[in-house]
Structures are given as C-alpha cells and as structure tokens.
Amino acid sequence: MNKIFKVGLVGCGHISETYFKSHEYFNNFQIIKCADINMEVANKCAEVNNIEACSVDELIKDKEIEIILNLTIPKAHYEIAKKSLENGKHIYSEKPMAVNFEDGKHLLQLSTEKGLYIGNAPDTFLGGGIQKSIELVSSGTIGDIKLGNAIFAFPGVQSYHPNPEPWFAEKEGGPVIDMGP
C-alpha cells in the first residue's frame, strides 16, 4: 500500500479549488488542513472541503503535516517555502518559486541541506515539448541560438480571477510573473 502524505494548503484563493477538485484522483496524498492570511477565507475553505482551518504559522509548525502546498501570491512564495523547509516540511508551490533568482537559489540550497523536496507548478516545463527542445539544442541539431521570441495569447489573470488586484500591486509583476516562469 502506498504511503499517504498529509498535506497542508496555504492560500485558500481561486487556485485552491482546482487542487481540491483534482486531488481526489490521487491516492498518495490528502489535504487535511488549510490556512490563509484571511481567517474568514480559510474557514470557508475548510467548511467546503471538510477539513480543519488554522493560521499559516500553526499549519507550517504542525507535526502532522508533511508537505506544504503553497498557493499564495508570488511575493509570498519565498517566505512560506523558507519557513516550511525550516520546519521540516516538503514544499510544492505555485509558480514562481521565488520572485528573484537569489531567493530561489536559497530555497534549493535549504531543501538540499534539510534533505527535503521542493517542487513547483506548472510542472509542464519538464514535459515532452521542452525536453525535445533541450535535446535538439544540446545535440546541435538546431545550432547556436541567437534570439528567442515568445508569444502568449491569453487575456490575463484579470479575465478569470475573482480578485486580480494583488497581481498588479507594486513589484508583483502582473501577468508576466504569473505566466512567464
């Protein structure tokens, strides 16, 4: 029988609904508690999903929790991940892992030191298309790359998110920080 990991979810906003709906298709983890900086939101999430709500600090320090699922806004990802690792928790976070390279590097070093796993969504960056691209570039089939261009035709977070304002706050990066990584 597979081990069932006990997961604590931080950030009970819009994206958490997707995780709650899809987690029932997996038999190796169970979201047992949730937290949010807004306790009203955490309590509502807990009630809807029949789990326990608590503060962010309580969740991160909870001995029963093995993995923290970090669904907060990008500028909070680093602090939540850092505290989680410091408290012996594996961490899986929405993108990006951190809003700057140094913080991301620090999280990877910390996870290695602690012997913990750290992962990020979307995991499609390691999918077939990207792996094939890496293969073609590495083998020299494509040749030296001199320029890259990307087009992402999507109306942005404001088209679907019930509360897009935090994404556009100072230093948040807007759609680029959401879709770019």
For each of these PLM feature ranges, what is it?
Residues 1-48:
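N-terminal Rossmann-like dinucleotide-binding module
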Residues 11, 95, 140:
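Conserved G/P- and acidic residue-centered "switch" motifs that form tight phosphate/ATP-binding loops
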Residues 19, 51-110:
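Beta-loop-alpha module in the N-terminal Rossmann-like domain of NAD(P)-dependent dehydrogenases
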Residues 26, 48, 62-63, 127:
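Acidic-histidine catalytic/liganding microenvironments
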Residues 33, 66-67, 147:
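Short, Asp-centered acidic motifs that coordinate Mg2+ and/or phosphate
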Residues 106-124, 143-148:
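Rossmann-fold dehydrogenase core element
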Residues 124-181:
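Predominantly a Rossmann-like dinucleotide-binding segment in NAD(P)-dependent oxidoreductases
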